[in-house]
C-alpha cells in the first residue's frame, strides 16, 4: 500500500513538473529552428536567430534599459532595505507588526493594482511616465523583497556577537559595519540576485509607467503581438537561462545561511 501511495505521489509530482516546464523546453528547442515558421519535426537546426538578435538594435537597447533599471532599483532597495530590516529586528515599538504588513503590500498585491495606483498617483507628484517612474516603481516592490530576505537572516543572527563587540568598546556604527554586515553578507548577495531577476522580469508595473523606451519584457511582449517567431524563442531562452542562473545562485547563498 505504501509503495502504491509513493508511486502515485511521485507520478503526480512528475506530471506537474512536466506540465510546468515542458513548454520551456519546447521554446528552447524551437529557438534553434532555421525556418522562420515553427514546425514539427524540425528539419534544419541553426544559431541564426541568436546571431540575428545581436544585430537587433531595439532589442539591445531594451536589454540596456532593463539592466539600468534593475541595477539602480536594486541599489536603492539595498540602501533602504538593510537599515530598515535592522530596525525591524532590533527595536520594538508601537505599530511594528502593522508596519511590517504595510511593507509587504507591494509583493502581496497584484502587479496590475500597484501599476494602476502608481499611474494615478505619480502625476500628482509631478512625475511623468518615464524611466524615472519605472525606477521608483521597481524600487518600491524590491524594498519589500530586500527587507524580507535580510530580516530572515537577522533573526538567525547570534545576538551575543553584537553584545560582545559593544562590551569591547566598539561604537554602534562600528558594530554594524564590522560585525553585523559581514555576518549577513550571503543574505545580502542572495537578495540582490533575486531582486535583479525580479526587476528584469517585471511587466505590470513597467507597462503602466513606461513611456517610449521599452524594457526587455515589454519589447518581447511587443514582438509576440506580431507572432511568435524563432527570434522570440531565442530571446526567451536567453532570459530563462540568465534568470535560472541568478536564482540558483541566490538559493545557494540563502542555503549557506
State the predicted function of each range:
Residues 38, 42, 47, 96, ...:
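Membrane-interfacial helix termini and adjacent extracytoplasmic/periplasmic loops
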Residues 36-73, 225-226:
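Periplasmic/extracellular loop-to-transmembrane helix junction in inner-membrane transport proteins
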Residues 2-5, 35, 50-58, 200-254:
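Interhelical loop and adjacent transmembrane-helix boundary motif
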Residues 60, 64, 68-80, 84, ...:
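Hydrophobic alpha-helical transmembrane segments of multipass integral membrane proteins
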Residues 22-35, 65, 115-126, 193-198, ...:
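A structural signal for multi-pass alpha-helical bundles of membrane permease subunits
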Residues 11, 17-24, 115, 147-150, ...:
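Transmembrane alpha-helices
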Residues 1-6, 71-103, 116, 120, ...:
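Transmembrane-helix boundary motif in ABC transporter permease subunits
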Residues 63, 88, 105, 160-168, ...:
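Short hydrophobic faces within alpha-helices
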